[in-house]
């Protein structure tokens, strides 16, 4: 990808990076392990972003 990106695209890509993380440990403790997985996880090879 190009080095110089438009700001809007950069922000959308950064949001995708942030949201692609596992559920924090404190959330599992708080919800008594009812929430253990992030179902919106995305793999860079398997699915594309609409950024």
Curated annotation (Swiss-Prot):
PROSITE patterns: RIBOSOMAL_L39E. GO terms for biological process: translation. One of its GO terms (cellular component) is ribosome. It holds the Pfam family Ribosomal_L39. It comes from Picrophilus torridus (strain ATCC 700027 / DSM 9790 / JCM 10055 / NBRC 100828 / KAW 2/3). This is Large ribosomal subunit protein eL39. Keywords: Ribonucleoprotein, Ribosomal protein. GO terms for molecular function: structural constituent of ribosome. Belongs to the eukaryotic ribosomal protein eL39 family. The gene is rpl39e.
């Amino acid at each position: 990808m190009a080095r110089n990106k438009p700001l809007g695209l950069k922000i959308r890509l950064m949001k995708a990076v942030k949201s692609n993380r596992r559920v924090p440990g404190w959330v599992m403790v708080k919800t008594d392990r009812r929430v253990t997985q992030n179902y919106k996880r995305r793999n860079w090879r398997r699915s594309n972003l609409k950024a």
